[in-house]
Amino acid sequence: MTIADSLGEVGETAALARIFPRLPAASAQLLGPGDDSAVIAAPDGRFVVTTDMMIHGPDFRLAWSTPHDLGWKAAASNLSDIAAMGAVPSALVVAIAAPMDSPVTLLEGIADGLRDACEALAPGCGVVGGDLSVSSTLTIAVTAFGDLEGRAPVLRSGAQVGDVVTVAGVLGEAAAGLRLLFERATTDGEPDALLAGELRGEFKHLILAQLAPRPPIGHGVRAAVAGATAMLDLSDGLALDARRLAKASGVALDLDPTAVGSREALDGGEDHSLLATFPADAELPDGFRVIGRVVTGDGILVAGQPYDSAGGWDPYTGWNGAAG
């Protein structure tokens, strides 16, 4: 067997034998990969669970992302959802469907990205199981579990009039990176791997904000302990996600344009930062900064004026069907 063997040539068993050693173990794991199901400790008696899917085309382009990027982003996006509930990420289950002619090294790279993201963003979280299948389109689906450690979950429905609106993490950087890729890493309208590599060298911070984001995972627990009244992961853009929080809480969010910054910060997606509201007299945990206030009404305001831009990312309206 050579390092360039395809999945079709080696089969599932041999592919898994090469992937398993690369995956991180979970601290809460009582029984990991190899049986029909994993067994995970739940000291709190409850667990938080979320799932997210990445599909080649609408969610990523192989010409732009390395396999390591894909594994990292698949982990990071799910870890951020767990953090947004005020929980500690404990375990991931990963399902991958890939074309038959995909090299096994593709899956090894994805596994390495999953491992490195867990170790960097949520130490102690690991991959406890999953599935491999064949498909004409590369698809990565991750289910994440989290431990509330005895606390109540922080919902998106608890914001109160008078609260401050805060964010931990970046705003607009992932959108800026994506804009650069579309503007400068395509040839005849198709993603270009060589140009993307050059961009990665020139604008590394912004490109990685899009392809391999670093959400502030540990800040979710800090926010919960500090008394956050509502919280949510900014996966689809500040304006769109803030509107969701406002609707769930029955309030309006008035955002400060100076604190928010660029239009990309409002309308761009995939930063995976944490949007949280706190009582006005709360001591904000390190890493959170005020970007607005909770007021009566509904929807989103910017400097007191309604902000009606659709903005954000909706996979059913935002994808143009491009390949690459």
Q: Can you annotate each of these PLM segments?
A:
Residues 48-51, 153-221:
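Short, acidic (Asp/Glu-rich) active-site segment that either coordinates a divalent metal cofactor
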Residues 67-91, 112-121, 237-244:
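Small-aliphatic-rich amphipathic alpha-helix that forms the alpha element of a beta-alpha
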Residues 89-184:
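Glycine-rich anion-binding loops of enzyme active sites
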Residues 2-3, 7, 11, 46, ...:
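Acidic, Ser/Thr/Pro-rich beta/coil linker or hinge segments at domain junctions
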Residues 101-103, 203-270:
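Active-site-proximal betaalpha loop/short-helix elements
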Residues 1-66, 94, 112, 116-119, ...:
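Extreme N-terminal cap/leader segments of soluble proteins
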Residues 29-34, 39, 131-133, 157, ...:
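Beta-strand->loop->alpha-helix junctions that form or flank phosphate-binding loops
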